Amino acid sequence: MKIVNRGYLSVKALQPFIEWVNAQEDEFILDERTEPNVYLIEEDFFDLEPVIKSNFKKIFLNELQAISEDEESYPAINMENFEAWFSVEAGTSVFDCEKGGVNAD
């Protein structure tokens, strides 16, 4: 087992995002049981707030773009909306249980 030199943010959809997704997309329905997405961040951080502030726009846009390319349907990309649309948990330990390498695009 290998230790990956990254921390992580686990980003889970809250009701406003779920409602937005379900209004955009007929192919699948999102609900509160939908698994969170994990974003790798710097390994050593002491205060979560600056990490979220420096990454929330990229994360918010990634979550929106995964559902729709219609930018006119997007909410304002700001911290207030991010906190209303997603819950975030952070951690500093990432372990790779696989033998093969990790591919990144």
Model-derived features: where do they sit?
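Extended, charge-biased low-complexity segments
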Residues: 1-44
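Amphipathic protein-protein interaction modules
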Residues: 42-104
